[in-house]
UniProtKB/Swiss-Prot annotation:
Record's subunit section: Heterodimer of subunits alpha and beta; disulfide-linked.
Name of this protein: Snaclec echicetin subunit alpha
Entry function: Binding of echicetin to GPIbalpha (GP1BA) receptor on platelets alone results in inhibition of platelet aggregation, while binding to both GP1BA receptor and IgMk promotes platelet aggregation and signal transduction.
Stated family: Belongs to the snaclec family.
Classification of source organism: Eukaryota, Metazoa, Chordata, Craniata, Vertebrata
Span of domain C-type lectin: 13-130
Listed GO CC annotations: extracellular region
Cysteines joined through disulfide linkages: 6-17, 34-129, 104-121
GO molecular function: toxin activity
Keyword list, A-Z: Disulfide bond, Hemostasis impairing toxin, Platelet aggregation activating toxin, Platelet aggregation inhibiting toxin, Secreted, Signal, Toxin
Length: 135
């Protein structure tokens, strides 16, 4: 199957490998950790509805219904005031976002409602890493 190209325990959609890590880290620690997991590894970015569904499945299998996990989204990497970037450089395109005056974003889910919540980067949360499937 598609998972053969990712290490054991990692999930794949054929394009990326994904793994949820439950040990809480700060945003910076988590991003550095993800950088080491694979070539071009980063904190989770979600670039499509399909990817969002896969992430949902991986997270609910591991954490259950209520969760907050770090995403690769941070206000620090902003180039202009209206564009946020994921840590892997791709642009963030979603309207379900609650921007306050802090810098990093967790994905928070309560049953079916998914929201992006701005949270101080020093807080610690579980997180998901993602890197391209090795070719």
């Amino acid at each position: 199957g598609a998972d053969e190209m990712c290490p054991p325990g990692w999930s794949s959609n054929g394009v990326y490998c994904y793994m949820l890590f439950k040990e809480p880290k700060t945003w910076d620690e988590a991003e550095k950790f993800c950088n080491k997991q694979g070539k071009d590894g980063h904190l989770l970015s979600i670039e499509s509805k399909k990817e969002e569904i896969l992430v949902d499945i991986v997270v609910s299998e591991n954490i259950g219904k209520m969760y907050k996990i770090w995403t690769g989204l941070s206000e620090r990497s902003k180039e202009q005031h209206c564009s946020s970037r994921w840590s892997d450089g791709s642009f963030f395109r979603s309207y379900e976002i609650a921007i306050r005056y802090s810098e990093c974003f967790v994905l928070e889910k309560q049953s079916v409602f998914r929201t992006w919540v701005a949270t101080p980067c020093e807080n610690t949360f579980p997180f998901m890493c993602k890197y391209p499937v090795p070719r």
